[in-house]
A protein has these predicted regions:
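N-terminal helix-rich structural modules
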Residues: 2-192, 197-198
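Short His/Asp/Glu-rich catalytic/ion-coordination signatures at enzyme active sites or charged loops
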Residues: 6-21, 71-90, 113-155, 213-255, ...
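Short, well-ordered loop/turn and helix-capping segments at boundaries between secondary-structure elements
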Residues: 31, 241, 467, 471-474
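Active-site-proximal, well-structured secondary-structure segments within enzyme catalytic domains
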Residues: 126, 130, 159-162, 169-213, ...
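Alpha-helix N-cap/helix-initiation motif
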Residues: 249, 253, 352, 356, ...
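Active-site-proximal segment of zinc-dependent metalloprotease catalytic domains
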Residues: 429-441, 446-459
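Active-site recognition of the HExxH zinc-binding catalytic motif
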Residues: 456-471
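Conserved small/polar residues in nucleotide/adenosyl-binding loops
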Residues: 475-480
Length: 481
């Protein structure tokens, strides 16, 4: 491989960092925050002193979110018993601290006084909007609550963070608990690349034969190509009942979801909202619950006609194979066949046009054409050999960095997401440049061939990169708070 220049931005030392160190850093950051809150007994007198309090809050938040960001990232992409234990053990303290911060009366009043002052209009627009958002967040975290209600909010908040973590762990564990060895006859219809992938999954589980897992690349391959209808049904049922009352009771999310729903409702009512949906929209663009509801209904009505037509086509095609009742585990398989018949176009035939290295090159050159930003791969410590680090440069000036971790593997949560590691903000040592993680679950490379992406995966990559770019290009100086 070509040698890369070292990262120019300060990046986390994933090759050296231990869970014990991370835990200590997080505990120390929480400690510093709590000390700061204890000392802030009243609103400072001058606007200078008030703005200085706001700046200190941003720095404390920056410290904590940086070390917590590394831990929660590892918990999502390299999940194992040790990481999970440290993560779980810190949740109560973290939740307690954020509740304390969000309900701190003197701090809230400091923000309020800055907003009410004559000096407010002269602040940079980004800072004004950050202050308005902070005031909104205080209200949403119960700053106005008193006595029992205040205590109850803190309990609910802590419990919800625990339940949300349990929920994710159950899904991950249930996904990984499933493995079905496949006989040759069951591979009928699968293209060579999918068979090689299932072979690789089998080897990883210590088997001498291909195996189906519930990882999305394996699941999609079988639902799209496997001629064996019984196999498709078995995988469909296993996949859709993960972490449910129909699976292993150890991973059952039913009680978790019931408790989350009832606590969310209680929390919303404590804060004066009629429902959790209403509470949730208080920090979103949509004006109210009815608007969102109507939007979804309109969307469904527009989609209904074409959907009915497509289902009719699939039913007709399945009937040719003697299938009288089209089931959910048949739609992926017959959709692919229909595309082949109508357009002579298969996902598989497109794949050679989308090798991952070429797609990244294409993505980066589009960004360069549209925004005049160059993307350069740099050497940086990573959590897994698949992960890579890049920096964005504009006329020789580094704007920020990002990591790509694109392929599905065991110990990694499903889906695709972007999470910030460090935000752009002015600190004591000058301007801090932003860095984020972009994570996907694409079909991994098999053997020493480059990974070949499906058209859907290419779409996802461009979508996630859009989030990342928006995050990196934003010029606001202050952090999220």
């Amino acid at each position: 491989a070509m040698t890369l220049e070292k990262a120019t931005l300060p990046v986390p030392q994933f090759d050296q960092i231990t869970l014990d160190q991370l835990k200590a850093q997080i505990e120390q950051a929480i400690q510093q925050g709590q000390t700061f809150l204890k000392q802030l007994a009243a609103v400072p007198d001058t606007i200078q002193a008030q703005l200085s309090v706001l700046a200190q809050v941003d720095l404390l938040e920056n410290n904590l979110s940086e070390s917590w960001g590394v831990l929660s990232h590892l918990n999502a992409v390299m999940n194992n018993a040790e990481t999970r234990e440290v993560y779980q053990s810190l949740l109560p303290a973290l939740s307690e601290y954020y509740t304390e911060l969000g309900q701190h009366t003197a701090l809230y009043q400091t923000y309020q006084q800055v907003q009410d002052s004559d000096a407010f209009a002269a602040l940079p627009a980004a800072q004004q909007s950050a202050i308005k958002l902070a005031l909104r967040d205080f209200k949403l975290s119960g700053v106005a609550l008193e006595g029992e209600a205040k205590k109850r909010y803190a309990e609910i908040s802590a419990r919800l963070s625990q339940l949300s973590s349990d929920f994710s762990n159950h899904v991950l564990d249930a996904t990984q608990a499933y493995c079905k060895p496949l006989a040759d006859a069951q591979l009928k219809g699968l293209p060579q690349s999918s068979i090689a992938l299932l072979q690789q999954y089998g080897q990883q589980r210590g088997l001498q034969q291909p195996a189906a897992t519930l990882d999305i690349p394996s699941y999609m391959a079988i639902m799209t190509y496997a001629a064996d209808r019984g196999l498709r049904e078995e995988l469909y049922r296993a996949y859709t009942t993960r972490a449910s009352e129909q699976g292993n009771p150890e991973f059952d999310n039913t009680p978790v979801m019931e408790e989350i729903l009832s606590l969310r409702q209680e929390m919303a009512q404590l804060l004066g909202f009629s429902s959790y949906a209403e509470f949730s929209l208080a920090s979103k663009m949509a004006p109210d619950v009815a608007t969102v509801h109507q939007f979804l209904i309109d969307l469904a009505e527009h989609a209904r006609k074409p959907a009915e037509q497509e289902i009719a086509e699939l039913k007709a095609m399945a009937a040719e194979d003697g299938i009288a009742d089209l089931q959910p585990w048949d739609t992926g398989y017959y959709s692919e066949k229909l595309k082949m018949r109508q357009f002579n176009l298969s996902q598989e035939a497109l794949k050679p046009y989308f090798p991952a290295p070429k797609i990244l090159q294409g993505l980066f050159s589009i960004v360069s054409r549209l925004y005049g930003i160059n993307i350069v791969e740099r050497e940086a410590p990573v959590w897994h050999p698949d992960a890579r680090y890049f920096e964005l440069e504009e006329q020789g000036n580094v704007l920020g960095g990002f990591y790509f971790d694109l392929y599905a593997r065991s110990g990694k949560r499903g889906g695709a997401w972007m999470s910030g590691f460090r935000s752009r903000m002015q600190t004591g040592n000058g301007l801090q440049k932003p860095i984020c993680y972009m994570v996907c679950n694409f079909t991994p490379p098999v053997g020493d061939q480059p990974a070949l992406l499906t058209h859907d995966e290419v779409n996802t990559l461009f979508h996630e990169f859009g989030h990342g770019l928006q995050d990196r290009k934003s010029t606001r100086l202050n952090s999220s708070h």
